[in-house]
Amino acid sequence: MDFRTLLKTKEFVILDGAMGTMLQAKGLEMGGTPEALNIDKPDWLVDIHRQYINAGSDIVYANTFGANRHKLEKCGYTVQQAIPAAINNARKACEGTDTLVALDIGPIGQLLEPTGTLTFEEAYDIYKEQILAGADADLIVFETMTDLYELKAAVLAAKENSDLPIVCTMTFEENMRTFTGVAISSMALTLEGLGVDAIGVNCSLGPKELYPVVEELCKWTNLPVVVKPNAGLPDPVTNEYNCSPEDFAEFAEKLIPLGVKVLGGCCGTNPEYIKKLAEMLKGKKHVSVHNDIPAACCSPTHTVVIDQPRIIGERINPTGKKRFKEALLANDIDYILGQAIEQIHAGADILDVNVGLPGIDEKSMMVKAVKALQGVVDVPLQLDSTIPEVLEAALRAYNGKPIVNSVNAEDSSIENVLPLVKKYGAAVVGLTLDENGIPKSADRRFELAKKILDKALEYGIRKEDVYIDCLTLTASAEQENVMQTVNAVERVKNELGLKTVLGVSNISFGLPSREIVNHNFLMMALTKGLDLPIMNPNIDSMTATVRAYKLLTNIDKNSVDFISHYGGEKKTAPAATGAKAEIDLPYAIENGLKKEAADLTAKLLQETEAMNIVNDMLIPALDKAGAEFEKGKLFLPQLIQTAGTAQACFEVIKNYILSTGEKSVSKGKIILATVKGDIHDIGKNIVKVLLENYGYDVIDLGKDVDYQTVVDCAIENDVHLIGLSALMTTTLVSMENTVKLLRENNVDCKIIVGGAVVTADYAEQIGADYYAKDAKESVDIARKFFGN
């Protein structure tokens, strides 16, 4: 029986529990590579798998979680050795049973760009290697993922190199976000669009704490939902998890009414947990839940549901824009970012991105623009090109669920574009034109809209993901056909039930007082059912029209949005004076405009003391970003971009100081290290970035750092503040030993500890001076310690 049949025939599918917990019980050394045991201790693995099978597991995960080329370097085995050995061990354990074997794949352990340095295609290649090596598995499971972009690379690697079923589970925190800020809705929309077989959550929390996460996920998908919780929460002092097998099963039972189909255990669980889970599920019926998933698009952190008029900003397009064309030819990405940020502040919900211009490599520029935009803004993008190759490159580079602009009713367009929309799980704008051009009548445009819808459904694209553009013709040239456009919008909306799109500004080409024409055409189209006006949101009367329409039609309940924008005193824009640079530098930093920020810094240095720029502009901008991050209004990718922009300013200042012969003053030296036996350093690296941008000299000792190395470095470099990180309960003892050795050697220092498994109580228990729950708190501690 294969996985897909298993899902259809069984009420519930039972997974196994933790592998690491079991290997540690058998004697896995701290800091050892679990995947090396596939070859060195195969009998251990066979025994563990058999214990889970006997407990009731329908599927066991092969011991391949960290079997990628980077993590295996330490033990000397290759992917091609470790993965087949793991699958063979699992197969041996499954003999005589119907138990399936999953190729278990975890995160690479490096951040992808724009947050990190690993490229999408590099990540793809790493996953491809694992998938090819695990071809003999029954299904592929990607688990414990926190970055949706990395997971997309993994899924594409699987779908393009294997026919095996795909299961994806991400790790969410109690704030309903992953470590990188991924929203549950964005995860569901993106992964279901990519065509995986099941999605869910694993790790981080116990079944009780995961309930609200699972509840939200079950509202956003019709795929089978997988839940693999931890055995509660770990006690960092005892390394024990606080949820017993009986309580685990009891809390898991409460997930059943939500529609959960697949259940297992993660960290801290063992065969006894799976046995209790299987006993609880015996005789119970799966609760089938069908959701009407709305028309929506998303970035990783933000989902836009098309349940009311939403503004698509039109300004990222070179047509008729001399300055934009110059920016494209000069490869000036900051100009594009500036246009994006300006539109979002003005009220755009989605941004159209078109970089088509003779004389440039449109494919390369589109990819560059998409990546840069997603590093700075969180609204979804509409990918706009007439060239299928450009669209595919943009779709591959995009993180989330975008809109494709566009397909039309020509057979060649349908054949070239719709397969891409289906493969990458996008929504699509259908233009009501064919080889004969734009029909004059509303009836013919309606027919073309229906053709596009029918073809999309044939390709397996959801009806909700098809948006129709009935095409705005210029009133100056075809005044008699203006009403044909709005009448077509009305029919498409009411008779086909599709979302509608119009390029509003086209109506007024060639006419005086264009704003008046645009404003009235927009209101007319909205009353006929326009959902997605493509327009210039920077023109206040246009965004005001949309807001007023929402108020008058009771979409904006109690006029909350309208009053928030127009109820207070009118804000006046700052005067365009010589002080503009001082006003704009914090803005440039906060919005991730690196080139503009660096240029403004250089200009300010001609008239302002370097340290005044740092203390009065750079640090406050970073503080503001940090505060927004703590409130959950800003997420890790944007925080890193802000820090990177500040770093560009610091580099300008540093070079200026060197050129003048002055001595750069450090705010203080700090050692950072991930403790012995722990190979996870993503969190520590983020702390490093922020500390450096606040002006501290960071000595980064890396990961898996020996206790004595920390002591020696502190003494040799006269460092008085040390930060230690641990991400695994098994390496907490290394953190304790490092602190102990520093104290025994009378090193004059204060110690900060942090990491996913560290708590304030544990910090106090081992004699650390400070506990930092995140990177921003590490900065706050450093500032307090150094008095700056």
Regions found by a protein language model. Give the residues of each.
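Domain-level signal for soluble alpha/beta catalytic cores
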Residues: M1-Y467, L473-N788
